[in-house]
């Protein structure tokens, strides 16, 4: 017997509360899939359960093959805000909205950026080692330093960049913002200094924190040429997306002493290969792309994802969360 229920694929990382928002409706059936499922297995699973009407994605790629396999896709939504793994033009051609979790993980990513700045400034790893290894007497040879009074350059002034600025202003830092899509008035109203020339601003910064999306415009933005513009005492923080920073160029700058250090939550290849050159540098701290995946953020993102799906199925998608509003 054919079911009239809408079939929704959800990744294993979706929270119980979010699942309940979907399953409490008698017109919805959910099918769970692994967060790190391979492309062939995902496509086969979609075909097996077709028609599939909605999908809540984690790290899984989604494009034309998956749309074809689904049969009757109505909405694709991410448990997150990045969508570089989704073929947006393919969705738009089929009039399928792509939705994201709005500001759900923005506080978490902003905290991670600040955490990385503080970890590097306060030399947390080195201080811990001195106590643990009994080299207390050498503590004055590697003094930590303050964020107070330092200059931060934020790249991208969206949901996360604005929150990072707010936190760093509270640390009494001077905050520069480069975002060609935001007005100087908006940036200044937030207590920051707007800069229109990235290359001219880089030599001024003690820290550079990247918060822009990964697009053709931003891929390779921090290459060897741009890294050379930074002060040798400066630090680079990337909690945005891998590929915005050219890792080979970053490694060369760090080894040559042209850059003081870096904090990386994202990488060109994820996971990065074991033994990757950056792994061996003492002035680099890393995290496995978890800046936006705190306990609280997962709950917020999951619930927003469920609401996105319901809004689309009910014919009124939450417009501010739609990446391709031209399909509406």
Residue ranges and their predicted role:
Residues 157-158:
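Glycine-rich Rossmann-fold phosphate-binding loop(s) that bind the pyrophosphate
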Residues 94-96, 102-151, 163-166, 170, ...:
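Phosphate-binding beta-alpha-beta segment of Rossmann-like dinucleotide-binding domains, i.e.
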Residues 94, 233-328:
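Rossmann-like dinucleotide-binding domain for NAD(H)/NADP(H)
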Residues 47, 63-64, 180-277:
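Rossmann-like adenosine-cofactor binding region
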Residues 52-54, 75, 207, 235, ...:
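Short, Asp-centered acidic motifs that coordinate Mg2+ and/or phosphate
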Residues 1-99, 203, 223, 229:
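An N-terminal-biased, well-structured beta-alpha scaffold segment characteristic
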Residues 28, 192-193, 283-284:
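Short, conserved active-site loop motifs that form the nucleotide-linked donor/cofactor pocket
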Residues 33-34, 79-80, 96-107, 179, ...:
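Short beta->alpha connector loops at strand-helix junctions that form conserved
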